[in-house]
């Protein structure tokens, strides 16, 4: 049985990146290479990612756009509230987390940003529904604050509003950035295009649940949060063509990974689809759609650390994180990146053996 403690590690707090680097591709890249008998670590710059890719490979990006989902306000009684929009339900209605001394009552109003009132609707545990007086997305973008992760200790500024978005973000709805994509810029895309490396896009609107801690020691008892995703016919066809030509499918970020694996059939094929996913990937999972993964460094005891451990192998991830800490890599959303290959199941780890991939 895998326990939460299996995914714990000590991280010096000064390694938690508090700001993004001015140059997106100046971040570091830890390439984790696997041979038959060993795991090797290569310390590179993110721009060196091109050295590990081949013509005909397909990079799959999540094109969700972070919305300004955080509001401060008050009840009619004067009590303070903090609202974090979780997702847009329709043009005027959202699902939101609300922090206040007492839960607001259905039918009452909240004044947000000293600018407009929202009406509290039915509870949808652990969220509330809120009705906006005008199109919600318009008011969110005009009056909301960028929802930086809880471990980033400064208030969001104009630099964050640029750097906590990917350069290709186009579908608004996320409350957290797909952070592996933050390392790509237009110059790197031009280089990838010149090499014959293809790009595909999906959408998964990242919810605040991505930051929720796992509260059970037996991880099999954890209930995963649900997020909306969409695989377009164009992406499904690009993946089919890549496979047919012998290319590799490379997920940029764990959100792309979760969407692809949610849509994949047992034989590895994908069809266009959209809907909710609460896929929880832990060691023992047999991957169907993804060969390589670009990802940042994740929080101790997090579901994302479990995902990368499932993909690259628990011992490889433990060693990689120890190496990254020793080499003073920057961690979490504004931190550095890793390039991981899919590993066969390791001896003593649950699950079926799978085909390994090489860089």
UniProtKB/Swiss-Prot annotation:
SUPFAM superfamilies with a match to the protein in the record: QueA-like
Subcellular localization: Cytoplasm
Residues spanning the signal sequence: none
GO biological process, one term: queuosine biosynthetic process
Pathway(s) this gene product operates in, as recorded in its UniProt entry: tRNA modification; tRNA-queuosine biosynthesis
InterPro entries given in the database record: QueA, QueA_dom1, QueA_dom2, QueA_sf
Documented EC number(s): 2.4.99.17
One Pfam family it belongs to: Queuosine_synth
Main location (coarse class): cytoplasm
GO molecular function, one term: S-adenosylmethionine:tRNA ribosyltransferase-isomerase activity
Subunit architecture: Monomer.
HAMAP family hit by this protein: QueA
Name by which UniProt lists this protein: S-adenosylmethionine:tRNA ribosyltransferase-isomerase
């Amino acid at each position: 049985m895998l326990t939460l403690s299996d995914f714990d590690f000590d991280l010096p707090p000064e390694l938690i990146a508090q700001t993004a680097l001015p140059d997106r591709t100046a971040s570091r890249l830890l390439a984790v290479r696997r041979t038959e008998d060993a795991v090797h670590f290569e310390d590179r710059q993110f721009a060196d990612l091109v050295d590990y890719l081949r013509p005909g490979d397909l990079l799959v990006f999540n094109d969700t756009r972070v919305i300004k989902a955080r509001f401060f306000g008050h009840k009619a009684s004067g009590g303070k509230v903090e609202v974090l929009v979780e997702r847009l339900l329709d043009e005027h209605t959202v699902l939101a987390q609300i922090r206040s001394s007492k839960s607001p009552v259905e039918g009452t109003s909240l004044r947000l940003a000293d600018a407009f009132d929202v009406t509290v609707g039915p509870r949808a545990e652990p969220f509330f529904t809120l009705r906006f007086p005008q199109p919600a997305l318009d008011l969110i973008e005009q009056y909301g604050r960028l929802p930086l992760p809880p471990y980033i200790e400064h208030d969001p500024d104009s630099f964050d509003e640029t750097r906590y978005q990917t350069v290709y973000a186009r579908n608004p709805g996320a409350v957290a950035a797909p952070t592996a994509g933050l390392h790509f810029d237009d110059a790197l895309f031009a280089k990838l295009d010149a090499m014959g490396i293809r790009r595909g896009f999906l959408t998964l609107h990242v919810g605040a649940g991505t930051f929720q801690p796992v509260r059970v020691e037996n991880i099999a008892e954890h209930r995963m949060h649900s997020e909306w995703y969409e695989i377009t016919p164009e992406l499904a066809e690009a993946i089919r063509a890549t496979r047919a030509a012998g290319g590799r499918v490379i997920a940029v970020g764990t959100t792309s990974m979760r969407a692809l694996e949610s849509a994949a059939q047992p034989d590895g094929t994908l069809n266009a689809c959209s809907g909710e996913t609460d896929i929880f990937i832990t060691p023992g999972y047999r991957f169907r759609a993804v060969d390589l993964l670009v990802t940042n460094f994740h929080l101790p005891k997090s579901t994302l650390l479990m995902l990368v451990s499932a993909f690259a192998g628990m011992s490889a991830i433990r060693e990689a994180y120890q190496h990254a800490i020793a080499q003073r890599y920057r961690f979490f959303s504004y931190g550095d990146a890793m390039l991981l290959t899919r590993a066969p199941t390791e001896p003593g780890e649950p699950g079926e053996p799978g085909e390994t991939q090489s860089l």
